[in-house]
């Protein structure tokens, strides 16, 4: 026996330690972090399950009146969602509200408390016995992308944080419970754990839970293997104390034992940890050559696995693993197992457990990485049994295959996808029984034609392993007008539907006046048996009574259908009226707001005008300009123009002085003649001529004085070609 095998045997024989006397430290532990009720997400896409279509099971509601609970989709059922690690939804599943497969949503956690351990800090203790495969707690924290994860790893390492709180949700999403999380963060590591982590699809998100690996006793510490999906900045010594302890946990460089496949994956691949350890022992040299230190699985081992076709018991394991796995090597092996499966009944089971939806997501995830993988998936889809196109349509896989056919450059993929689309195009949609049609009522139909009415209160999930043959009702009678029959592959029975009325039922519809039961086809001729009180009248009465009852039942059905239609129409009308009312209210509100805005604007403008008017009225009016000032202004417009020609000789300053003196003289003359007469707006030509003549006379006198005074200077300038004199006007 190898050392590894001996450790495994010791681990199995090991009696777990109980912490019944340890003090409850839950409140104290809660003070060390911020407790979250739900995971938070750094973006909308972070932590996405990748399942854009809702995964619905095919179970029926199973109401327990004593417990007042819907017991559908329980642990012992064959709910296709539960076996593939998908939680049911009240909104989309047909199993009724609040089924047993909503443990994450309802927070159905085990009874646990936090305790103080000797070497490992806080730990999580079971307060009562926990049975195998039970949901213990959800691992909650901040869901971040890979870039943020890398940054936080460095940051926490710098801050010397030694505890591990990162969990890999998927290859690009990580849960960080370092600062914010739930009590699940206190689960310690063990090399021989009593629990394991598993990823479940809940709505549009992938969530992580801790589940019991075996029966857990009251007082046991709950532990799982940190080396599966959990990360820390540095490797740490392990203090689990188990016989098979590998001494170290976490860090970038994983030990061989740390790279063992998770339980669900190894089962789906059809291998055991014992086989994997044996392979590691024999091929240890391959690890350093064929994979990097960042790998989280033994890649060489996965590639070496020789897979086989699926058995019936393998279906849920493989499909559940395929829905959650992101590693290409593992995906290739899982697809290979489905590819090797040729049994139609097993392939039908694969289709039932979300086969089309799962392969659709696999194609989307790896279409650019592995053409051979996509080719195998298309071949698998082509060989699957096809009766209707219902599941093909609901999974939206047809659009994915069309995308391959349109955009792929590979001729083989184009042909496979084209052939598959052509084959799917020939299929028809099957009419489905609407949800909750008569599920909560026993059939009111009388036991006619020698058979009992079909019970409607069926178990939500059919028993596993029972293959029911199609049940065909043998009768020569034609169906009533408007009724048609169809076969339901899920229940292997016929059902009846009326397309015009939009109703369906399990019981065969009968005409308003049903025929009596048929007798045997070939009875031997014999003497009639005489019975007391048995005559033709009595038999006729029974038939008439049955006919009357059946007519009343049909009448009630029609009345109920009519009332239902009226109710729907009334509700629709109410919705329309409500919508119209809301629209009118919205318009009215918008108009009101618009008017209020206009009124406010008017008030603002009026206030502005009022302020402006007030400011203007506060300024005193300017005093009237005196008459002499008005004459000054009038003459000042013309005199400078008359003197401009003298500027070259006497200069600008002298011109300004002459103009000022001349205007002053003219104003004095006007004021002397007519002191009360204002000047006209414009002077006439005669007036302007007089001003011009007077200006000339004034300047002639000024020039005589100016020239006389500057004779000597002017003589000097004339000798050097200097200042030129103004040519006198010729009269």
UniProtKB/Swiss-Prot annotation:
Give EC number(s), comma-separated.
2.1.1.359
Instruction: Specify the superkingdom.
Output: Eukaryota
Known catalytic reactions: L-lysyl(36)-[histone H3] + 3 S-adenosyl-L-methionine = N(6),N(6),N(6)-trimethyl-L-lysyl(36)-[histone H3] + 3 S-adenosyl-L-homocysteine + 3 H(+)
| WW domain span | 477-511
Q: Where is this region: Disordered?
A: 436-487, 510-552, 606-628, 708-731
Provide the AWS domain boundaries.
52-108
GO CC list: chromosome; cytosol; nucleus
> Which CDD domains would you find in this protein's record?
SET_SETD2, WW
Cellular compartment(s): Nucleus; Chromosome
Listed GO molecular functions? histone H3K36 trimethyltransferase activity; RNA binding
**Comp. bias intervals (Polar residues):** 531-540
Q: Which UniProt keywords apply?
A: Chromosome, Coiled coil, Methyltransferase, Nucleus, Repressor, S-adenosyl-L-methionine, Transcription, Transcription regulation, Transferase
Q: Where is the composition biased (Basic residues)?
A: 607-616
Ranges for domain SET: 110-227
PROSITE patterns this protein is in? AWS, POST_SET, SAM_MT43_SET2_1, SET, WW_DOMAIN_2
Bias type Basic and acidic residues, positions: 460-475, 541-552, 716-731
Q: Does the keyword Metal-binding apply?
A: no
Provide one Gene Ontology biological process annotation: DNA-templated transcription elongation
The record's family statement is:
Belongs to the class V-like SAM-binding methyltransferase superfamily. Histone-lysine methyltransferase family. SET2 subfamily.
Q: What is known of its domains?
A: The AWS and SET domains are necessary for transcription repression.
Role, per record = Histone methyltransferase that trimethylates histone H3 'Lys-36' forming H3K36me3. Involved in transcription elongation as well as in transcription repression.
Which PANTHER family has this protein been placed in?
SET DOMAIN PROTEINS
Q: What is this protein called?
A: Histone-lysine N-methyltransferase, H3 lysine-36 specific
The species this protein was found in: Debaryomyces hansenii (strain ATCC 36239 / CBS 767 / BCRC 21394 / JCM 1990 / NBRC 0083 / IGC 2968) (Yeast)
């Amino acid at each position: 026996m190898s050392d590894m095998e001996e450790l495994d045997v010791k681990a199995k024989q090991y009696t777990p330690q109980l912490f019944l006397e340890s003090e409850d430290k839950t409140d104290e532990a809660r003070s060390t972090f911020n407790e979250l009720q739900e995971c938070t997400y750094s973006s909308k896409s972070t932590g996405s399950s990748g399942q854009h279509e809702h995964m619905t099971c095919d179970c029926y509601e199973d109401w327990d009146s004593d417990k007042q609970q819907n017991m559908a989709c329980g642990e012992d059922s064959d709910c296709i969602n539960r076996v593939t690690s998908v939680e049911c939804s009240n909104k989309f599943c047909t199993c009724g509200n609040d089924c047993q497969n909503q443990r994450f949503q309802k927070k159905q956690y085990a009874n646990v408390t936090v305790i103080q351990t000797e070497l490992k800090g806080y730990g999580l203790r079971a307060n009562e016995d926990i049975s195998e495969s039970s949901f213990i707690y959800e691992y909650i924290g901040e869901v971040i992308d890979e870039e943020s994860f890398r940054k936080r790893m460095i940051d926490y390492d710098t801050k010397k944080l030694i505890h591990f709180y990162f969990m890999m949700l998927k290859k690009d999403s990580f849960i960080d419970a370092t600062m914010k999380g739930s009590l699940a963060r206190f689960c310690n590591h063990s090399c021989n754990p009593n629990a394991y982590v598993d990823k479940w699809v809940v709505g549009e998100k992938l969530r992580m839970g801790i589940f019991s690996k075996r029966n857990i006793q009251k007082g046991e510490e709950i532990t799982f293997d940190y080396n599966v999906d959990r990360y820390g900045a540095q490797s740490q010594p392990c203090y689990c104390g188990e016989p098979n302890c590998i001494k170290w946990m976490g860090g970038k460089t994983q030990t061989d034992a740390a790279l063992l496949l998770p339980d669900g994956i190894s089962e789906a691949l059809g291998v055991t940890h014992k086989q994997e350890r044996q392979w590691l022992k024999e091929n240890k040299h391959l690890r350093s050559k064929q994979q990097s230190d960042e790998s989280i699985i033994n890649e060489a081992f996965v590639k070496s696995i020789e897979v086989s076709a699926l058995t019936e018991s393998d279906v849920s394991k493989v499909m559940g693993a395929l829905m959650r796995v992101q590693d290409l090597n593992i995906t290739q092996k899982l697809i290979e197992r489905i590819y090797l499966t040729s049994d139609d009944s097993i392939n039908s089971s694969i289709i039932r457990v979300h086969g089309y939806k799962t392969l659709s997501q696999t194609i989307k995830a790896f279409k650019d990485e592995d053409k051979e993988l996509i080719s195998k998936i298309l071949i698998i889809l082509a060989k699957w049994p096809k009766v209707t196109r219902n599941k093909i349509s609901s999974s939206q896989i047809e659009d994915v295959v069309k995308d391959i056919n349109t955009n792929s450059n590979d001729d083989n993929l184009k042909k496979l996808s084209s052939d598959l689309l052509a084959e799917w195009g020939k299929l028809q949609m099957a009419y489905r029984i609407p949800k909750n049609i008569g599920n909560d009522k026993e059939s009111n139909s009388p036991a006619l034609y020698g058979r009992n009415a079909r019970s409607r209160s069926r178990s939500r999930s059919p028993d596993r392993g029972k293959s029911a043959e199609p049940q065909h009702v043998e009768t020569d009678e034609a169906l009533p007008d408007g009724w048609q029959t169809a076969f339901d592959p899920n229940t292997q029975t016929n059902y009846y539907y009326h397309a015009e009325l939009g109703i369906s039922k399990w019981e065969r519809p009968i005409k308003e006046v049903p025929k009596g039961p048929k007798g045997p086809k070939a009875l031997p001729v014999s003497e009639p048996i005489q019975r007391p009180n048995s005559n033709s009248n009595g038999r006729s009465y029974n038939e008439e009574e049955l006919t009357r009852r059946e007519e009343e039942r049909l009448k009630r059905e029609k009345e109920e259908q009519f009332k239902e239609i009226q109710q729907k129409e009334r509700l629709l009308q109410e919705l329309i009226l409500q919508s119209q009312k809301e629209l009118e209210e919205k318009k009215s509100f918008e108009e009101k707001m618009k008017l209020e805005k206009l009124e406010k604007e008017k008030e603002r403008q009026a206030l502005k005008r009022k302020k402006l008017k007030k400011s203007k009225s506060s300024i005193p009016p300017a005093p009237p300009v005196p008459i002499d000032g008005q004459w000054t202004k009038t003459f000042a417009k013309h005199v400078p123009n008359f003197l401009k020609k003298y500027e070259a000789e006497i200069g600008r300053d002298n011109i300004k002085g002459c103009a000022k003196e001349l205007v002053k003289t003219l104003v004095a003359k006007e004021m002397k003649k007519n002191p009360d007469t204002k000047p006209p707006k414009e002077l006439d030509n005669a007036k302007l001529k007089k001003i011009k003549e007077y200006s000339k006379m004034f300047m002639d006198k000024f020039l005589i004085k100016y020239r006389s005074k500057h004779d000597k200077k002017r003589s000097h300038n004339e000798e050097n070609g200097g200042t030129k004199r103004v040519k006198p006007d010729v009269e």
